[in-house]
Amino acid sequence: RIKKFDFNKEYTHVKSYWRKYVKEDNGLELKEPTNSYEEKIQDIYRRSILLFPLLTNQTTGGVIAAPEVDEELTQCGRYGYCWPRDAIFIAKALDILKMTKETEKFYSNFCRMTQSKNGMWEQRFYTDGKLAPCWGYQVDETASVVYGVYSHYEYTKNEEFLKANLHMCEKAIDFLKKYVKDILEKTGIYHVSYDLWEMYEGIHLYSLASIFSAFDSMIKIYGVLGKNISDFENNRLKEEKISKSIDEMSNLKIEIKKYIDENLYDENRKSYVRNADDKRIDISLLGAVVPFKVFSPKEKRVLNTVENINLTIRTYTGGYQRFEYDHYRNGAPWPIANLWMTLYYLENGEKKKAKETFDFVLKTAGKHSFLGEQIDNNTLKPNWVIGLGWSHAMFVIVLEKLNKM
């Protein structure tokens, strides 16, 4: 049977299949490149389109963080799990590419099957929905799911999707309300969560920003559905409960913003800090602007923070580290960090600076146009895990923003 295998025929068939796949999923409708700069962008863009389905469990909708070649998960990056946070960014990229069925399966199937009884999501899962080894939950993952559900609606305008996932979101919101009240009232009932880098426990600005956005998204979900919520139509008790919840979330949004300003802004450094205890500058501080919109990009404190980011975690090559004194794998720059800076600069209308931070990602992509988790500052080549879904998702999100300008 091996002798009868026509390699050239099979190669042509596979090549044709994936070329058709890329063409059909060119959601941004990018035109053919006219120069080497545009060609580089197209190469990474196409690679992203090809990468996402390879990370996705087509049955459950679960999305792993990066390709994992070791089935025992001991010799590689151990990234063959689904982190809700990473997956939410990838889901947004899928929506941009008009792969909306894949996004809907992630939320309507995978997220619903993995939600805990108390409304939260644990740190990470196998793509079949089973709980993976965990060492500490991150509250931003729970908040990000609610944010992501409404984000998906913004692309599809599918009210049935919102109705189908309403109960899931309400359970998550109930958990987040209790978590925030615990912080504000200092009751100590809920254990503080880890940060998005899974390294430090505490009350983190990024986490609070994600919760702010979850409340905002839930208010908008109720606004879209109005009184036309399946199973609750003409139910006065349900309407009263929703009205009360909206008021409560609106007040908690105000309290979160107040807490951040009073506890997570360092007057000496003239900067927001990631945590009240360690007060380090962190690229995730930008999350309060994009995507979570707690602050506008032009607010004085935000501008001061961006200046501090450039002074502390921008390296001599133009790449950005995750945070001050980041020693993980020698504190290399992360494409995610550069792309986050790019998104901020685009939000603030600073196109020249946006191009500078974006170009670093272009010139450090691998020879097959994969984006790594990190960049070696000496060789300017991808370092550690290569083909990181979050990096490629952020790249697509940046391209969408550029296309709208």
List each language-model region with its residue ranges.
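Acidic/His metal-coordination segments adjacent to aromatic residues that form catalytic metal sites
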Residues: 69-76, 121-137, 182-203, 263-267, ...
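C-terminal capping/lid segments that line or modulate ligand- or cofactor-binding pockets
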Residues: 79, 90, 125-127, 132-155, ...
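Acidic/polar, glycine-enriched structural segments that form the non-catalytic walls/loops
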Residues: 1-78, 159-160
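Active-site acid/base region of carbohydrate-active enzymes
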Residues: 30-61, 110, 114-120, 134, ...
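Long, well-ordered core segments of solenoidal/helical folds
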Residues: 50-59, 98-121, 165-187, 238-241, ...
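Well-ordered alpha-helical scaffold segments within catalytic/enzyme domains
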Residues: 27-39, 50-54, 80, 88-100, ...
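Extended ligand-binding clefts on enzyme/binding-domain cores
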Residues: 44, 204-210, 232-336
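Aromatic-rich carbohydrate-recognition surfaces in CAZymes
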Residues: 14, 79-183, 208, 212, ...
